[in-house]
C-alpha cells in the first residue's frame, strides 16, 4: 500500500508491499493478449468490476521486468461440477440436507482490460505472473496521470476518487484535454434524477476553478439554466456530510459555493418582474435583466424564422434591412421622412412608410423587393417581440452579459427555464455566438469559457432538421478548442445527441444508465458486467472516459457545496408579483435606498405602465449617480413625438 498523497501531487511508494490477490492464467480457450488477460483470485479477495490490478512478470523483457496494469471488466465463478444435476444428487435433492463429504472447489476468474504496459515496447501478450491489488502509485501510472501530475506540468483537474480494497485514490483529468488545446469538451449522460449529471458538472467546475493552472490563462463558465431551479442558488452554501467534506479535502477543492456568480434573466411578458425563480429580495443583488432590441435580434433572425419564412427573396430583404436600415439614418425620395431605425417600433414605422409609398404610387416593387415580400417579412419580424416578450423589447433597450469584461473564475448563469422554447433558442444562439466572436478577437476578458448546456439532445438532436443552433454546436464541438470555447453538455440519452457533438467530446462521463440506452450501438465497447454496474450506480458514482485512460474508470465525487434548487426555492421563495409601481420602486431602490413608493406613484401618474417600466429599465442599465433625475428624464423621453401619426408616418408637407 502507499501513503495517501494530496491531490495534484505524485503518490509516493511506501515500504509496505502491495497485497497479492491472484495469478494470471492463460489457456488455449482463454489466451492472454496485449489488451486483455484473465486471472484467478482467492474467494475473499476484494476484487470487483472496475478494480484496478497490476501484474508483475518474473521474466525480464528487453532488460526490464514487465509491469502490466489492467481494470477488471468481467467476472465468473464456477466449480468442478459438470452438470447442476451432480450437486442435486450429492444433496439427495434436499438443500437442507447434510453437507457433502467433500467440499467442492470454487474458483473466481476475472477478465481485465489492459490499461498500461511498462515497458510500452515491445507490445506483447500479458505474461503469466502474480496479480496485485493496485496501489496509489499503480493507479496513477495505469491511468497515465503521472505525466500531468509531474512537477512543472501540473495540469491535473480532480474529477473524483477511485475506491477499491480499502484504497481511495484521487483521479485527475488533464486540463489540456478538458479545456484545450489538445482536446476539449465533456459529455455526461444518465437517467434523470439518479445520474446526478448537474451535480457532477458543478463539482467539476469547482475543481477546474481551484486547479486550473494560472499559466494556462483565465477561465470562466457560462451556464444555461433550462429547467427548474437547478442552477439558481450557486452562490449559496449547501449541506454537506462529513464524508463529502473529507473528499473535498483529499481532492484539494474548497467545500464552499462559487465565490463569483452573476445571474441574467429576461422579464416576464408583462415586464414587471424578472422571469426567474431567483426573485427573492435577499438574492436580487447579482441578478441582471437580459433584454435585447432589434439590432441584437435581427442578426439571429434565422433562429426564430422557419425555412418556409426564409426563402431567397425574404432573406435578401432581411439582409438589406440589417445592413442598410437598422442603426443608421435611412432616406429615400419616396418616403415621407428620414428614418432612424433603432427598435421594433421604428422598424414598423419604416415598413408602413414603404408600403404606403407603394400603394400611393400603384407599384408592386420597391428597390427590387416585391410588395408581397415586404408584407411577409414585416409580419414575421414584427411578431418577434411578441413571441419573445420579456426578452425582446419594442423600444430597443439592451441589457446584456458583460462581453469584454468577463471575470476570472466567475460563473455567469443565464436563466431561461421559464421562457418559451423560441426564446431559449435565441438566447443560446446569440450568447454562444458572442462568446465565440470575443474569443476570436481575444477581448472577452478570459482565455477559456466553459459553456454548460443541459438537455443537449434538444439543441443538437441526432435526427431532425439542421437548425441554426445545431450547426453552431457542431462547429463548436469541432473547432471550439482552438478558441478556448469549451462545451460541457448533459443529456439523458447520449444516443439521441448528434454523433459529431458527442464524438468530439474529449471526456465522456456516465452516471446511472437506462437499460434500453445501454443496448444502443454507442455502448458496444463496454462489457456486459460494466453495463450491469452502470445500470445500478448510486448517486455520486460515475464512469469516466478520458483520452489518457485506455479504459473507462469508475469514480466517486462529493456532492456540490452549493444549495440545491428545491431547497433554495423553499428557503428563498419568490414573492407575489407586485404592481408595476411597486416593481419600479423596488428596482430603483437597489440604486438609491431613499426612493419610496409614493414618489414613484406621483411622478409616473401621467404615464402608463409600459412607459414607466421602460424608464426603469433605462435607469437600471445606466446606474447613474442621481437616480431620481435619471428616472424623470427617462420618463420624459418616453412621450410619443407629436409629429408622427398613429401609424408611425409623418404627414407629408
Indicate residue ranges for each PLM-predicted region.
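Phosphate-binding and hydrolysis-coupling loops of NTP-dependent motor/remodeling domains
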Residues: 2-15, 52-57, 107-123, 130, ...
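Conserved ASCE P-loop ATPase motor domains encompassing nucleic-acid-directed helicases/translocases
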Residues: 2-151
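Short secondary-structure boundary/capping segments
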Residues: 88-89, 235-249, 278-281, 466-469, ...
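Glycine-rich phosphate-binding loop of nucleotide-binding enzymes
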Residues: 163-262, 499, 544
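P-loop NTPase motor domains
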Residues: 212, 216-219, 223-224, 228-234, ...
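Conserved P-loop NTPase catalytic core
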Residues: 245-276, 503-524, 535-538
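Conserved ATP-driven motor cores of ASCE-family P-loop NTPases powering translocation/secretion/packaging/pilus
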Residues: 468-469, 474-561
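Conserved P-loop NTPase motor module
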Residues: 539-653
Amino acid at each position: 500500500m502507499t501513503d495517501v498523497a494530496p491531490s495534484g501531487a505524485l503518490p509516493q511508494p511506501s515500504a509496505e508491499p502491495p497485497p497479492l490477490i491472484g495469478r494470471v492464467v492463460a489457456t488455449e480457450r482463454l489466451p492472454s493478449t496485449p489488451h486483455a488477460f484473465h486471472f484467478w483470485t482467492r474467494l475473499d479477495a476484494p476484487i470487483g468490476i472496475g478494480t484496478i490490478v497490476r501484474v508483475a512478470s518474473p521474466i525480464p523483457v528487453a532488460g526490464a521486468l514487465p509491469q502490466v496494469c489492467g481494470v477488471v471488466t468481467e467476472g465468473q465463478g464456477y466449480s468442478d461440477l459438470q452438470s447442476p444435476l451432480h450437486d442435486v444428487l450429492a444433496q439427495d435433492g434436499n438443500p437442507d440436507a447434510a453437507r457433502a463429504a467433500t467440499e467442492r472447489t470454487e474458483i473466481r476468474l476475472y477478465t481485465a482490460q489492459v490499461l498500461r504496459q511498462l515497458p510500452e515496447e515491445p507490445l506483447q501478450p500479458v505474461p503469466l505472473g502474480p496479480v496485485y491489488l493496485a496501489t496509489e502509485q499503480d493507479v496513477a501510472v495505469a491511468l497515465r496521470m503521472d505525466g500531468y501530475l509531474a512537477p512543472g506540468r501540473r495540469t491535473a483537474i480532480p474529477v473524483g476518487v477511485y475506491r477499491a480494497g480499502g484504497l481511495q485514490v484521487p483521479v485527475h483529468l488533464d486540463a489540456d484535454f478538458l479545456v484545450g488545446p489538445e482536446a476539449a469538451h465533456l459529455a455526461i449522460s444518465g437517467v434523470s434524477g439518479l445520474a446526478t449529471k448537474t451535480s457532477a458538472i458543478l463539482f467539476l467546475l469547482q475543481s477546474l476553478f481551484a486547479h486550473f493552472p494560472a499559466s494556462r490563462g483565465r477561465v470562466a463558465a457560462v451556464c444555461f439554466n433550462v429547467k427548474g431551479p437547478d442552477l439558481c442558488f450557486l452562490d449559496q452554501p449547501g449541506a454537506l456530510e462529513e464524508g463529502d467534506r473529507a473528499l473535498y479535502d483529499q481532492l484539494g477543492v474548497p467545500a464552499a459555493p462559487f465565490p463569483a456568480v452573476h445571474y441574467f434573466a429576461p422579464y416576464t411578458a408583462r415586464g414587471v418582474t424578472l422571469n426567474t425563480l431567483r426573485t427573492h429580495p435577499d438574492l436580487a443583488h447579482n441578478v441582471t435583466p437580459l433584454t435585447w432590441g432589434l439590432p441584437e435580434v435581427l442578426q439571429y433572425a434565422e433562429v426564430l424564422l422557419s425555412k418556409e419564412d426564409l426563402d431567397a427573396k425574404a432573406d435578401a430583404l432581411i439582409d438589406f434591412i440589417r445592413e442598410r436600415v437598422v442603426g443608421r439614418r435611412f432616406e429615400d425620395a419616396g418616403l415621407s421622412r428620414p428614418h432612424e431605425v433603432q427598435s421594433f417600433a421604428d422598424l414598423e414605422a419604416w415598413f408602413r412608410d414603404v408600403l404606403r409609398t407603394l400603394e400611393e404610387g400603384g407599384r408592386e416593387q420597391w428597390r427590387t423587393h416585391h410588395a408581397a415580400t415586404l408584407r411577409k417579412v414585416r409580419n414575421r419580424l414584427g411578431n418577434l417581440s411578441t413571441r419573445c416578450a420579456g426578452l425582446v423589447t419594442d423600444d430597443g433597450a439592451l441589457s446584456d452579459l458583460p462581453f469584454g469584461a468577463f471575470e476570472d473564475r466567475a460563473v455567469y448563469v443565464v436563466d431561461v427555464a421559464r421562457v418559451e422554447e423560441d426564446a431559449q433558442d435565441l438566447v443560446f444562439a446569440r450568447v454562444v455566438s458572442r462568446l465565440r466572436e470575443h474569443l476570436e478577437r481575444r477581448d472577452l476578458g478570459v482565455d477559456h469559457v466553459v459553456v454548460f448546456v443541459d438537455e443537449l439532445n434538444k439543441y443538437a438532436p441526432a435526427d431532425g432538421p439542421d437548425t441554426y443552433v445545431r450547426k453552431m454546436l457542431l462547429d463548436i464541438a469541432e473547432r471550439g478548442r482552438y478558441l478556448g470555447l469549451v462545451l460541457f453538455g448533459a443529456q439523458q440519452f447520449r444516443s439521441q445527441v448528434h454523433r459529431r457533438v458527442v464524438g468530439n467530446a474529449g471526456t465522456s462521463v456516465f452516471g446511472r444508465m437506462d437499460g434500453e440506452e445501454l443496448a444502443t450501438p454507442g455502448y458496444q465497447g463496454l462489457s456486459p458486467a460494466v453495463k450491469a454496474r452502470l445500470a445500478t450506480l448510486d448517486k455520486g458514482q460515475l464512469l469516466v472516459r478520458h483520452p489518457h485512460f485506455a479504459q473507462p474508470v469508475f469514480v466517486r465525487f462529493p456532492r456540490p457545496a452549493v444549495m440545491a434548487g428545491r431547497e433554495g426555492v423553499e428557503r428563498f421563495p419568490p414573492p407575489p408579483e407586485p404592481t408595476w409601481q411597486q416593481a419600479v420602486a423596488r428596482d430603483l431602490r437597489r440604486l438609491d435606498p431613499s426612493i419610496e413608493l409614493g414618489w414613484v406613484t406621483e411622478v409616473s401618474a401621467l404615464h402608463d405602465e409600459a412607459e414607466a417600466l421602460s424608464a426603469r429599465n433605462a435607469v437600471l442599465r445606466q446606474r447613474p449617480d442621481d437616480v431620481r433625475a435619471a428616472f424623470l428624464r427617462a420618463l420624459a423621453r418616453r412621450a410619443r413625438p407629436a409629429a408622427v401619426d398613429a401609424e408611425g408616418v409623418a404627414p407629408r408637407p
